[in-house]
């Protein structure tokens, strides 16, 4: 009898210890792919500090515009300021976004490929004309590069050998699988993500033609978890900022 009484007294405590606590609300984020390494690190740090999981979906800026216009809803958007301004005008995002950082463009080749001269704008022009294939994306950085080719007066010559992809990952895969004189252009952060697979960052575009794409994090107006979304945006612009800098997003 005494044993039964002891068990009865202990059992509620054991059940309380084994019962999991309340699940923390998860937030969803739609972001441009160029900030992926920094945002992944910040999301992990935020979850560790607060217990709130962060589920991130990466798309190009044109895809983000399309999804937001179609009514897709996330808790937070991370996109270039011009896109965020459009979303704000349409009432899709809240006020109080924070600057995440900016990403510059770089030149990428596969292992063993001849290293091109990228020392100045004229060298880039020669490199592009000499390449058998010129690879870049259809996102913000790719649109800039296309305009750069037009300003250089060589777009008509480059277009037949240009390979354009929706994502940076596809650009890197094309370069890695190449067998000739392929040269790729894309955000430096995306190039570095494929370093372990063999991509070689030749270097950034020269200063006179470099282009930086900035990114802003902002809560969506129709987000389901507004308080957590706002906390995450504050974290990204504060404690999480060094994680972006460490990933090459300055």
Regions picked out by a protein language model, each given a short descriptive name:
Residues 18-62, 66-72, 81-90, 95-103, ...:
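Exported/periplasmic ABC-transporter solute-binding proteins
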Residues 5-16:
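Bacterial N-terminal signal peptides
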Residues 75-76:
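Phosphopantetheine-dependent thiolation modules in NRPS/PKS and related acyl-activating systems
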């Amino acid at each position: 009898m005494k044993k039964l009484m002891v068990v009865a007294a202990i059992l509620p405590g054991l059940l309380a210890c084994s019962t999991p606590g309340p699940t923390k609300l998860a937030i969803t984020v739609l972001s441009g792919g160029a900030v992926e390494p920094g945002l992944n690190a910040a999301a992990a740090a935020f979850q560790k500090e607060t217990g709130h999981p962060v589920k991130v979906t990466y798309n190009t800026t044109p895809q983000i515009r399309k999804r937001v216009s179609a009514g897709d809803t996330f808790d937070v958007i991370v996109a270039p300021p011009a896109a965020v301004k459009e979303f704000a005008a349409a009432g899709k995002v809240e006020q109080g976004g924070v600057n995440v950082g900016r990403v510059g463009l770089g030149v990428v080749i596969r292992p063993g490929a001849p290293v091109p001269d990228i020392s100045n704008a004229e060298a880039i022009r020669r490199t592009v004309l000499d390449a058998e294939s010129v690879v870049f994306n259809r996102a913000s950085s790719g649109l800039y590069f296309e305009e750069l080719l037009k300003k250089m007066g060589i777009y008509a010559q480059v277009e037949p050998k240009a390979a354009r992809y929706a994502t940076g990952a596809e650009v890197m895969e094309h370069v890695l699988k190449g067998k000739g004189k392929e040269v790729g252009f894309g955000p430096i952060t995306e190039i570095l993500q494929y370093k372990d697979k063999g991509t070689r960052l030749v270097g950034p575009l020269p200063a006179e033609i470099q282009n930086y794409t900035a990114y802003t994090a902002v809560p969506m107006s129709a987000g389901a978890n507004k308080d957590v979304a706002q906390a995450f945006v504050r974290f990204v612009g504060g404690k999480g900022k060094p994680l972006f800098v460490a990933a090459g997003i300055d």
